[in-house]
A protein has these predicted regions:
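Short acidic, low-complexity intrinsically disordered linear motifs used
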Residues: 1-9
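Beta-strand/loop-dominated core regions that host nucleotide or nucleotide-derived cofactor-binding catalytic loops
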Residues: 11-41, 49-133
Length: 133
């Protein structure tokens, strides 16, 4: 953000993203990829590299993965998604230990946001009574 932007109020776009996994499914088109469903906070793009964190596990180390596809609630393929329930395809996601409650996020996300996303995903996955998105 330069001086000109500062003086005239142009704000830098928030680049952080947090996504709690509420459901996981195999990808029928590519068995190595993994499809997950959940609520995205921030903006996620196809091609983004995200960190996979399992807050409920003492053994899993954070891992990095790439988002290969996004689908909105209307089942339309999109290039980016923000603040909505979405279907995310994780490239080579099968090799990562992803389950309900796993959090996908960008660098620099606070511990509070990670925990809030984890709790939201767990509550929706096990207590909301909804299936899918």
């Amino acid at each position: 953000m330069g001086l000109f932007d500062f003086l005239f109020g142009k704000k830098k776009e928030n680049t952080t993203v947090v996504f709690g996994v509420e459901e996981r499914l195999p990808n029928p088109n590519n068995l190595e990829d993994l499809v997950v469903i959940g609520l995205v906070r921030g903006t996620i793009h196809v091609g983004d590299e995200v960190i996979i964190t399992n807050l409920g596990s003492d053994n899993d180390k954070p891992a990095k993965a790439v988002i290969s596809a996004l689908e909105d609630a209307n089942k339309a393929q999109v290039k980016k998604a923000s603040g909505d329930n979405v279907v995310v395809t994780i490239k080579d996601g099968k090799k990562h230990n992803v389950y309900k409650g796993t959090v996908l996020h960008s660098e620099g996300v606070s511990e509070d946001k990670l925990r809030a996303s984890y709790l939201y995903a767990i509550l929706n996955a096990f207590f909301s009574g909804k299936v899918g998105y």
